[in-house]
Each structure stands twice: as C-alpha cells, then as structure tokens.
UniProtKB/Swiss-Prot annotation:
This is Transmembrane protein 52. GO terms for cellular component: membrane. Residues 145-209 are annotated as: Disordered. It comes from Homo sapiens. Keywords: Membrane, Signal, Transmembrane, Transmembrane helix. Pfam families: TMEM52. The chain crosses the membrane at residues 56-76. The gene is TMEM52. Its main location: membrane.
Length: 209
C-alpha cells in the first residue's frame, strides 16, 4: 500500500522536467547549422541531420508512455486496496495458539529440592492445614495409592510398617473385654478341671462294679 503514494510523489517531481527532455539535442543541432554551408557531399556532423533524430523522439515517447502506465496502475491499485479496506468489517485479531511445554522433574533436581524446601518452610510438619470441611480422621482414611508418575519416591519399608501399626492396634483394642462386664455381677461358669494322674478319684461303693 505504500508503493502507490511513493510512485505518485516521484511522478510529481518528474513532471516539470518532462517538457525539457526533447530540448536536450537542440544545442547539437544548432551547432551543426551554425556552419551555414553544408553540402551533402561534404562531411557534415550527423547531429545536424533531422533524419538521424527520429529514434531519439521515439525513445522519449516510449519512456513517457511507460511512466504514464506506471502511474495509472499505481493509482488504480491504491484505490482498489483502499476500497477493500473500507468494505471489510473490523474483525478482532485471531488469537495465536499457545504452546505448552512440559518439563519433567527428577527428585534429585535442584528445582524439586527448592519446591520441597519452600513447601516445608511454608507448612511445617507439625502444623495442620486449615480445612474448610472440618477435620479428617486419619485412622479411617485409606492411604493413597502410589502412582508411578508422582515426582516423590514411595515411603520406605519402616515408615510403611509404622503407618500400618496404629491401624492394627485399633481393632485389637476393640476386641478386649470391657471391665464393666465383671463389675455388673454376672456369674462366670466354672471351667471343668481335666483329669490327670494326680487327681483323686472318689471311693467306690462295694456294690458298684
């Protein structure tokens, strides 16, 4: 779109000089006619003959026609582009798609250590996070399944055993008899003693077999 105004500006500068182009060979012609007596048999300069100047006028005419054609084509193109810009509605620029880069982090990487140290400073181990839906019972909750895609390593064997011991002690305590049952006055059935070699048998009567 910027070529049209530049071409028009250049043509405006050349238009005052166009009428002077045919006058350039006139001084040479004047010098040829200054001799006065120039017969065809004599060796006259070729610039003095009008028959040798026809190709110069033809070249100048061709140049003028080319300039006029270029100016006309530039003006037509500029007008067409301007009309198309006015006819098209102003649409918002299209959004360019965003590229998402996924960076894998290893547990030994400095980025992972920085993130874990920042989280440990912000939330210490002894501090409980505020939950909007109340406190959670840690004994009733099942441990989350370990995923291979998590950046943190799985817990060691000792930690897993320590985590499983409180859950095993809970059901064992619930199965113990309550001390209130003995104080309620219930009678316990005597356990029969087993017969052994040291146990004394009752004396037999004389009529018994």
């Amino acid at each position: 779109m910027a070529r049209g105004p530049l071409a028009a500006r250049g043509l405006r500068l050349l238009l005052p000089l166009l009428p002077l182009l045919p006058l350039l060979p006139l001084p040479q012609v004047a010098l040829g006619f200054a001799d006065g007596s120039c017969d065809p048999s004599d060796q006259c300069p070729p610039q003095a003959r009008w028959s040798s100047l026809w190709h110069v006028g033809l070249i100048l005419l061709a140049v003028l026609l080319l300039l006029l054609c270029g100016v006309t084509a530039g003006c037509v193109r500029f007008c067409c582009l301007r009309k198309q810009a006015q006819a098209q509605p102003h649409l918002p620029p299209a959004r360019q798609p965003c590229d998402v880069a996924v960076i894998p982090m290893d547990s030994d990487s400095p980025v992972h250590s920085t993130v874990t140290s920042y989280s440990s400073v912000q939330y210490p181990l002894g501090m409980r996070l505020p939950l909007p839906f109340g406190e959670l019972d840690l004994d009733s909750m099942a441990p989350p399944a370990y995923s291979l895609y998590t950046p943190e390593p799985p817990p060691s064997y000792d930690e897993a055993v320590k985590m499983a011991k409180p859950r095993e002690e809970g059901p064992a305590l619930s199965q113990k008899p309550s001390p209130l049952l003995g104080a309620s006055g219930l009678e316990t059935t005597p356990v029969p003693q087993e017969s052994g070699p040291n146990t004394q048998l009752p004396p037999c009567s004389p009529g018994a077999p």
